A protein has these predicted regions:
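Nucleotide-sugar donor-binding catalytic core of glycosyltransferases
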Residues: 29-181
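A conserved, positively charged/aromatic
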Residues: 4-15
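A short, active-site helix/loop in glycosyltransferases that binds the activated sugar's phosphate group
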Residues: 15-32, 152
Length: 181
């Protein structure tokens, strides 16, 4: 059992995910104390904020994105994977990107695939203690899927609207997206 299964399987732990599909996937696996909770704000607090015209010019935009683009472990995993595994994982991610409202990652990553990856890792480095489990690999693919989706959306929005990105990472490669830090 991996750490995430221990955490989610503990009946004392209540977990709230802002990602509805991820929360449902965990519930489908039998973790009954995982719930979807959209990110919220205190609207009344923001109603009272008054900006100068200089601040409005600096921070105002038609679209603002605040947050991480999920720089996860996918590049590190694919770097040491077989060409077949890389191609399969890319195909799975690209398929998931096309299926809004459906979640396939947990169904298309099976035990044999994970075992084959672990066997390959062991062949590369016989002394390695690195072992992937299905939940960890699916999580890595979830993050990469979200990252690619956010990159696509930011590129699209930046090409059509005044768009600002607030993130710790530097993404100055986007055309039409102003990185605000």
């Amino acid at each position: 059992m991996c750490d995430i299964e221990k955490t989610l399987g503990n009946p004392c732990n209540y977990v709230f995910c802002f990602d509805r599909i991820q929360a449902q996937a965990y519930r489908n696996q039998g973790f009954d104390t995982v719930y979807h909770l959209p990110l919220g704000i205190n609207a009344k607090r923001y109603e009272n904020i008054r900006l100068s015209s200089e601040q409005r010019s600096k921070y105002g935009s038609q679209v603002s994105f605040i947050g991480s683009l999920y720089e996860g472990q996918y590049p590190a995993i694919t770097e040491i994977s077989t060409d077949y595994a890389k191609g399969y994982m890319d195909a799975v991610i690209n398929s998931q990107l096309q299926l809004y409202g459906a979640y396939i990652l947990n169904d298309v990553i099976d035990k044999r695939f994970v075992e084959a990856m672990n066997k390959h890792f062991k062949e590369l480095q016989p002394d390695t203690k690195f072992q992937l489990d299905k939940a960890a690999l699916v999580h890595v693919l979830d993050q990469e899927t979200s990252r690619r989706e956010r990159l696509l959306l930011l590129n699209l929005l930046g090409s059509r609207f005044d768009t600002k990105l607030y993130s710790r990472q530097d993404y100055s490669v986007f055309r039409g997206v102003q990185c605000m830090g």
